[in-house]
């Protein structure tokens, strides 16, 4: 069980009680529009987070100068959604950038501790069948239980000698593996892979691969793009379709797989700390991976609370390292190829 951490308000220690603090900032004193513009979430959602994370962010104390869970959560949300520790964000709640940084660290760890509660594949057969039905209704692709893709998130260089995080654009990044359902809910998130790894290598070494290699529901597949190799449990598009049925398969595959592309764009637009618009995450790879995962947890909680996650403006494709020619090669897995051809003949001929 994680030990709750009490964060002290350094501004109070420096300036005394006359300095405005978040304990004097009341959510009920500001409008919903203000909360959305500054922190990206509505009032009731913030109250829910206070209830969910409060025990991890505070403990009984005689100190009067501890920053409240509410303060810490607002500071973290402000960073996640804006991507910076800008002065106006701290001023809005009466804390310094240093205090904001500590708040972000604590809220991030509290969310990461709860990741498995909000990010997981459904366990029962009825839920699995529901996934298949929903994906099939999108473009007629049978047996799909999730769409998978990778996304690079820029981080600061760990050190001059470590090149494992340098991606094909020559920038340092984490390559994150994500699986979503048709609603955009995240069912698998792995955020710690170094940016030098190609998508197919990330998948090969992932917990997701181990999970599906050891067993999966019958006639169930993930959909991946051409950066992945074909597997018995992962359907990829045909590199060179020849027959009408193969073209129909590729069109259905593309239309269905687009849900993960849309989800990743939306995730980065909602959480600007991920999109690089304010620069790379200025943390170690481990801390950066936790921040990414925390944003993913918030994304899923938003969906559970009925928030319209698609309403964030999406400006276009996320800039990512270029794919190499080797990523367009077909797998030599003969059994996987047989399964795909059988599916094409059965459902697209």
From Swiss-Prot:
Compartments where located? Nucleus; Cytoplasm
Q: Which domain of life is it from?
A: Eukaryota
Name the coenzymes or cofactors required. Answer: a divalent metal cation
Q: What does this protein do?
A: Transposase-derived protein that may have nuclease activity (Potential). Does not have transposase activity.
PANTHER family, alphabetized: NUCLEASE HARBI1-RELATED, PTHR22930
Record's subunit section: Interacts with NAIF1.
Segments passing through the bilayer: none
Cite the DDE Tnp4 domain residue spans from the record: 148-300
Keyword Hydrolase in the entry? The reply is yes
* Entry EC number(s): 3.1.-.-
Query: One GO cellular component from the entry?
Result: cytoplasm
Molecular function GO terms recorded: metal ion binding; nuclease activity
Q: What class of enzyme is it?
A: hydrolase
Keywords noted in UniProt: Cytoplasm, Hydrolase, Metal-binding, Nuclease, Nucleus
**Which residues are involved in binding a divalent metal cation?**
149, 199, 225, 261
Species this protein is from: Rattus norvegicus
Higher taxonomy = Eukaryota, Metazoa, Chordata, Craniata, Vertebrata
What Pfam families has UniProt attached to this entry? DDE_Tnp_4
* Presence of keyword Nuclease: yes
Its name, as the record gives it, is: Putative nuclease HARBI1
Similarity annotation: Belongs to the HARBI1 family.
